[in-house]
Every structure is written in structure tokens, then in C-alpha cells.
């Protein structure tokens, strides 16, 4: 071998060789297969090209590591829950504390609820552990960024679908949160996305007032051109999925037949300004709408008449949504007066639009327990959603990009109910987005929250693991001298609760370094009328 051919390079090639080791004469035995790995060492020559220069490593590159993609796999939690149910073990959520050794005991959010959706434990700390999205997971960005107007999880929870100002649908993986697909769905911004209760259809409404019908494969099968004169703000399906309602900035609500959608079946008139939100109750014959005229109206979809109007809001009502689980008799409303209100439909006086334009129900006075006010927001509330498995948990997003989680069963500040008091958040994520949080949606199992904002980002949040120092602190995770405050764990012996508890330090992330508002430690008390 000539010397100018270059240095010798050794290459090791593994080759799999399959050999039958023997046969068994028993009729039910098959031949066993033994696999051997044979390593062959080969030598080859390699001539470097003329002018070859070794790559210079940039300064500081040796410290770089491959990017780690976070994955949220809830299979282990469901597996443990299934085994516990088969073995007849009882769940004791009061034993869940902020210490890393309790990670193995973490169960799915639905494991901590009763049949009616209420928490099995009266310990508010369990709500924080099981249902509070306090851990940042991943940010999802399109190659060409546009404000995110709407987001919804697919019914199976495997993917997330977002709609942007450019009219694009973007499909994200629900476990690794990476990009999967993108398509041009509308010619203008996608303002609303809604899956049917059966999961077989998807409706989308855009900024120009058009409605499109989609199959789960995102195949468009029907279009209603100019369903409204102005932007469609929200859509909602009837419990049977045979009808749906749309709300628009033209001040009208329209009820459509899903199979005969050429013309609106009925038009609901009564709002004096833009309709910002609409929802159809999953059991009752009720439609709720919120408007820029500072009013909330309840409608009878059969007669297309207004059956009640709620006065007393100080600004635009941006979001109205019925309770999806539990008793399903609560109504949540987010307003641009920096508050949210929880209304109990069972304790409200009836009113009728036929009595005059001002007929309706005023906001309850102090001491009236038909309403609870959720306070503590740093700016106007633009988005609101209920937790899918915990009937007493509500999450809201504000204009400044913060996300708040409330437990409506806690005692209002001041110990009284009414518009002058308020329930404070159990967890706050300051500056979750750089600007307004335009949409919020929980995973069907409730362990992951998606938020979309006008900062052109989609972010994913999960409940923190016990003792996770990087999660955002709440009043139940607030570190004390010996770890978690014992008085936030009612029913747990002080001596045993202090044993083995590590001090939880709060580690700020690069994007979220705003100080969290101080929250008082109030003992949880169920609100009469909110009982499930």
C-alpha cells in the first residue's frame, strides 16, 4: 500500500447473524432462535481533499448541550390509578405535600374528584397539586408568527388546534408539543373554534363573518358565507349537536340547523352593541351571551326570547361560559373591569324582556350568596375557562398576559359575599404572555393548560410535581421556615407533616420574573348554593 494514500482508519461494523440453536420435538414448542452479533473490523484508506482545514470550534460552543424537548406523558399516573382501583386502595389526597418523594403518588386530576366533580378532600392544597397549571412546559411558535386568536384540544386530547390572525390552522402534538401540520383555513383571522360534543365535527368562525364546517381530518365540507355582517366572536353547539349558535360584533346571535345551514333558523336580538361571547348549556335549554353593552343575557333557544338580563357590570363582558362538570348550574363571566363573576343559576330571580328594555336581574348586594366575585387581576379579563374535571376551578387570562387560577369554594376576602368582596386566586402566573391572553383551553383530562396570546405565541402549562422548585408559587406552596406551612394542610398531624419535608425554593425563569401578589391564607369553606 502506497504511503500517499492517507492514514489507515479503523471501522467496526456490527452484523446480526441468526442461528437456529436446536429443535424441540414437543408438539407445542417452536424452534428457538439465537442471535449473535459478529463484529467485523475493516481497514480503509481515506484521502483528505486538498486545502482541508479542520473546523474551528466557536468560543463557548463546548458548553452547549442538545436541546431537550419536554414531554408530558400521563400514562404512568393513569396506570397507577388503575392499579390502585383494582387493588381496592383508598385515595388519601391529604397526604400529598410539596416534597419530591410524593411524585410517585401523583394521580390524574380526575382521581381527586367525586362523581359530581367536587374534590374528595376539603384540603385546598389538593386543588393546587391536582388542578393548578403552575409549571411552564413549552412554547409553540409558527415559522411565520401571527397573533393566536383561538385554540382547542382535539376530543381525544392527542393534539391541539390553534387559529391565528392570518387564517391558518396549526396542529400541535399534545404530548411533545411540536409542530405537526399547518393549513390555510380562512382568508381572515380565525376568531373561534368549537368541536361538537360527539367529536365528529369542527366549526370555525372568522373575522369576516364566515363559518366553516370541518371533519376531524380537517377536510372542509361546508361554508356559510357572510353568516354575520361583522366578525364572529364565538360559536357553541347544542347538546344534541343538531344546532349551533353564533355571536357576532353586529350585535346579533343566530341559531343554525347543522344539516340545513343555508339560512339562520332564528335571530336573537336584544344587545345594543357587539356580542363578545356565547355559550349553549349542555343540559338546560339556555343560551348565554356577553356583550360590549355591559350586559349578560340568557335566551330560550326554542322561543328565541330573552329570559333574563344581568346588570351591574362596569365594562365589556368578554367571556361567558357555563360550568361543564359538577352540578352544571354555575355561570362564569369575565369582564374588562378586572373581575370575574360566578353566578348561581338556581338562586337568581327570573326576569323577562317583555317587561321592558330594562327588565332583568341586578347584581346581588353584599351578603347575597348567589354570586361570587373573583378579584386580584392586574388588568382586564379577556379569556376564561372552567377546569374539565374539577368543577370548582376557574382559570382566567388578562390583557397584560397574566394567568390566574381560582377555587370558587374558598372564603371571599372579608368573609362576606357580594360585589364588595372577592375570592383571591390560589395561583398566579405573572407575565405568562408578553401581551393579552386571547384564549385558554384545558386538556380533556385537565393536567395541561394551553394559552394563546396576541404576542404570537402558544404556551403550554402543566400542574407541578410535588416539590418542583421551578413552578410558580401559590399560597399553598409558599415556602416557610420548615417547608410548607402546616396550617395550609388541615387534618394532617403537625409532627408527621414536618418530617421529611424539604424547603421549597422558588427558581425564577428567564421570561417570568415578576413578583407575585401576596395572598392571604383563608380556611376553605363551601359557598351555600354552590354545593354539588
Swiss-Prot record:
Q: Where is the composition biased (Basic and acidic residues)?
A: 61-72
Record region (Disordered): 50-72, 513-532
Q: One biological-process term from Gene Ontology?
A: co-transcriptional mRNA 3'-end processing, cleavage and polyadenylation pathway
Q: Where is the signal peptide?
A: none
Gene3D superfamilies in the cross-refs: YVTN repeat-like/Quinoprotein amine dehydrogenase
Would I find Repeat among this entry's keywords? yes
User: Which Pfam family, any one of them, does this sequence belong to?
Assistant: WD40
- Name a GO CC annotation attached to this entry: mRNA cleavage and polyadenylation specificity factor complex
Q: What keywords are assigned to this protein?
A: Chromosome partition, mRNA processing, Nucleus, Repeat, WD repeat
Q: What job does this protein perform?
A: Required for 3'-end cleavage and polyadenylation of pre-mRNAs. Also involved in chromosome segregation where it has a role in chromosome attachment to the mitotic spindle.
Task: Name the chain's protein.
Answer: Polyadenylation factor subunit 2
The record lists the lineage as: Eukaryota, Fungi, Dikarya, Ascomycota, Saccharomycotina
Amino acid at each position: 500500500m502506497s504511503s500517499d494514500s492517507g492514514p489507515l482508519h479503523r471501522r467496526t461494523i456490527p452484523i446480526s447473524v441468526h442461528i437456529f440453536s436446536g429443535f424441540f420435538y414437543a408438539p407445542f414448542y417452536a424452534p428457538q432462535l439465537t442471535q449473535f452479533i459478529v463484529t467485523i473490523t475493516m481497514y480503509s484508506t481515506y484521502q483528505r481533499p486538498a486545502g482541508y482545514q479542520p473546523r474551528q470550534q466557536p468560543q463557548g460552543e463546548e458548553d452547549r448541550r442538545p436541546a431537550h424537548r419536554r414531554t408530558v406523558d400521563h400514562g404512568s399516573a393513569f396506570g397507577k390509578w388503575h392499579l390502585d382501583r383494582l387493588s381496592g386502595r383508598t385515595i388519601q389526597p391529604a397526604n400529598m405535600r410539596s416534597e419530591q418523594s410524593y411524585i410517585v403518588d401523583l394521580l390524574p386530576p380526575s382521581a381527586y374528584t367525586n362523581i359530581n366533580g367536587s374534590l374528595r378532600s376539603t384540603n385546598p392544597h389538593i386543588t393546587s397539586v391536582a388542578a393548578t397549571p403552575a409549571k411552564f412546559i413549552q412554547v409553540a411558535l409558527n415559522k411565520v408568527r401571527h397573533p393566536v386568536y383561538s385554540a382547542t384540544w382535539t376530543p381525544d386530547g392527542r393534539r391541539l388546534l390553534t387559529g391565528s390572525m392570518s387564517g391558518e390552522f396549526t396542529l400541535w402534538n399534545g404530548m411533545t408539543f411540536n409542530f405537526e401540520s399547518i393549513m390555510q383555513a380562512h382568508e381572515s383571522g380565525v376568531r373561534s373554534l368549537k368541536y361538537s360534543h360527539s367529536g365528529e365535527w369542527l366549526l370555525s368562525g372568522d373575522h369576516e363573518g364566515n363559518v366553516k364546517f370541518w371533519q376531524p381530518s380537517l377536510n372542509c365540507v361546508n361554508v356559510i358565507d357572510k353568516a354575520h355582517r361583522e366578525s364572529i366572536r364565538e360559536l357553541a353547539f347544542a347538546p344534541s349537536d343538531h344546532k349551533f349558535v353564533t355571536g357576532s360584533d353586529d350585535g346579533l346571535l343566530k341559531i343554525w340547523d347543522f344539516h340545513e345551514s343555508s339560512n339562520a333558523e332564528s335571530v336573537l336580538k336584544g344587545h345594543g352593541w357587539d356580542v363578545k361571547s356565547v355559550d349553549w348549556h349542555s343540559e338546560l335549554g339556555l343560551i348565554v351571551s356577553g356583550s360590549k353593552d355591559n350586559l349578560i343575557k340568557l335566551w330560550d333557544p326554542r322561543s328565541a326570547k330573552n329570559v333574563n338580563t344581568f346588570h351591574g357590570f362596569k365594562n365589556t363582558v368578554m367571556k361567558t361560559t357555563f360550568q361543564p362538570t359538577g352540578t352544571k348550574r354555575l355561570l362564569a363571566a369575565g369582564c374588562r373591569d378586572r373581575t370575574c363573576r360566578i353566578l348561581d343559576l338556581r338562586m337568581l330571580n327570573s326576569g323577562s324582556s317583555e317587561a321592558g328594555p330594562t327588565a332583568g336581574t341586578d347584581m346581588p348586594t353584599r351578603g347575597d350568596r348567589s354570586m361570587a366575585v373573583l378579584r386580584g387581576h392586574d388588568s382586564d379579563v379577556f379569556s376564561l375557562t372552567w377546569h374539565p374535571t374539577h368543577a370548582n376551578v376557574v382559570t382566567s387570562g388578562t390583557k397584560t398576559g397574566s394567568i390566574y387560577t381560582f377555587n370558587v369554594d374558598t372564603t371571599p376576602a372579608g368573609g362576606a359575599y357580594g360585589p364588595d368582596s372577592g375570592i383571591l386566586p390560589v395561583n398566579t402566573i405573572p407575565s405568562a404572555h408578553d401581551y393579552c391572553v386571547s384564549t385558554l383551553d384545558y386538556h380533556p383530562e385537565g393536567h395541561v393548560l394551553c394559552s394563546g396570546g396576541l404576542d404570537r405565541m402558544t404556551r403550554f402549562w402543566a400542574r407541578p410535581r410535588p416539590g418542583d422548585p421551578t413552578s410558580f408559587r401559590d399560597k399553598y406552596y409558599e415556602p416557610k421556615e420548615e417547608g410548607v406551612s402546616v396550617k395550609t394542610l388541615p387534618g394532617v398531624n403537625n409532627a408527621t407533616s414536618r418530617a421529611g419535608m424539604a424547603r421549597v425554593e422558588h427558581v425564577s425563569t428567564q421570561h417570568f420574573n415578576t413578583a407575585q401578589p401576596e395572598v392571604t391564607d383563608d380556611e376553605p369553606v363551601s359557598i351555600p348554593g354552590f354545593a354539588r
